Regions:
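Beta-propeller domain segments
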Residues: 22-35, 126-134, 138-163, 173-174, ...
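Beta-rich, blade/repeat-based domains predominating
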Residues: 48-61, 94-119, 167-182, 274-297, ...
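Loop/turn residues immediately N-terminal
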Residues: 70-71, 194, 375-376
């Protein structure tokens, strides 16, 4: 046995040395390197950024990076294939942070759609744990809307989020990640639930409510789910069934109290509220979502939280989709709908000294680029054998 172990160690050491020799510039993180699922490889390709979050490729293959206190930067690498991207050259594209200043966390996310052109989706959240104003559509709180850009002219006044646009959803506390399913154009969001949750005055916050994957229909004329209420600020997704009780299952919606105006029956009335397509662990904090072009898989970045011990999230996970329906393959009651791609082997270093993913972007070769805001980094993650 010792001989075989020694041989394996020698083989792996030689293989790693070979890979590094093919890519002479290897950046190393200042913390334990993330763990990878079988069949995947990853490499740190940029350091020293200022809390990078949203990332997006331009038409020339450069990566646009939104950085806190900096603005928008553009980075281009020497591309030697697979995870070997070297010599990053950074240019500040937008250096004024004034144009990006936001006094709170209301308007959080933007998405331009492809299958229905000229539509800009905007998700507006809340700074509050529980926001009573979200109950009233007229406030504009906790909503997802689409805006038609084709009707704008240089003389047009700017859209007013509260009074303009096409309402896709209400009752979304903080749906930061938005994605368009590439084959049918279905609109999805990932929802961050509140903390400090109680039910009938009993603390259940460690494992409830769950984070959510919500479906908002299509922009091509179908009205399925559009304008629907997804529950917040009164109804929340079950993650831990035992803590919630009441015979509810994962993905059902529960009320914090049981009275005539707010109760579990009302929360689960499909004529009133739309339940999530999938539910994820409480406090895992999903912040971005992106689909493969063939519609078979989507990736979600879980930013993570310290609400539980050990901390949860701090990972990129995948969800399988049915390309003939544009819907997840897992049932809404599943607790195992995600498969981790890259995560931290020891989350005790989190949040300040570990991989903490936020934004994601896929390049033309199918490589997944990820920002880690806590560490000021960009990583590239590759399914082995999928690119040269």
């Amino acid at each position: 046995m010792k001989l075989s172990i020694d041989w394996l160690a020698l083989f792996l050491g030689s293989w790693i040395t070979s890979v590094q020799s093919m890519c002479p510039t290897i950046l190393e993180p200042a913390y334990p390197a993330p763990s990878l699922a079988a069949g995947w490889s990853a490499q740190l390709i940029a350091q020293g950024l200022s809390r990078p979050r949203t990332i997006l490729f331009d038409t020339n293959g450069g990566l646009l990076i939104l950085q806190q206190g900096v603005g928008i930067a553009h980075i281009k690498w020497t591309d030697d294939g697979s995870t070997c991207l070297q010599n990053p050259v950074q240019t500040i594209v937008v250096g004024s942070t004034v144009v990006l200043t936001n006094d709170d966390s209301t308007t959080r996310s933007l998405l331009t759609t492809k299958l229905t052109p000229n539509q800009l989706l905007i998700s507006r959240g809340t700074t509050l744990n529980i926001d009573p104003e979200a109950e009233l559509p007229s406030t504009g709180h906790c909503q997802l809307k689409s805006f038609n850009l084709s009707t704008l002219t240089p003389e047009s006044p700017p859209y007013n989020f509260t009074t303009s646009g096409h309402l896709l959803a209400t009752g979304l506390r903080n749906s930061v990640g938005l994605a368009e399913e590439p084959l049918f154009g279905g609109i999805y969001s990932v929802e961050n639930g509140p903390g400090n949750m109680t039910r009938n005055n009993i603390d259940i916050h460690l494992y409830n409510p769950g984070e959510e994957l919500n479906f908002h229909g299509y922009l091509n004329g179908s009205s399925e789910n559009q304008g629907a209420n997804y529950g917040f600020p009164y109804c929340f997704a079950v993650w831990n069934e035992l803590d919630v009780g009441g015979g509810l299952r994962v993905g059902d919606q529960f009320s914090m109290v049981q009275n005539k105006s707010s109760n579990d029956t009302w929360c689960n009335n499909v004529e009133v509220h739309v339940a999530p397509k999938l539910t994820f662990a409480a406090h895992s904090a999903p912040l971005d979502m992106i689909f493969l072009a063939n519609g078979t898989e989507a990736f979600i970045s879980f930013h993570g939280s310290l609400e539980t011990t050990p901390p949860v999230g701090y990972r990129i996970s995948s969800i399988t989709f049915n390309p003939t329906t544009g819907l997840p393959t897992s049932p809404s009651t599943s607790t195992i709908s995600t498969s981790d791609i890259i995560s931290n082997s020891n989350s005790s270093f989190c949040p300040g000294n570990c991989f903490r993913p936020v934004g994601m972007a896929l390049d033309g070769l199918g490589r997944l680029f990820v920002s880690s805001d806590a560490t000021g980094e960009i990583w590239v993650v590759v399914r082995m054998g999928s690119v040269g």
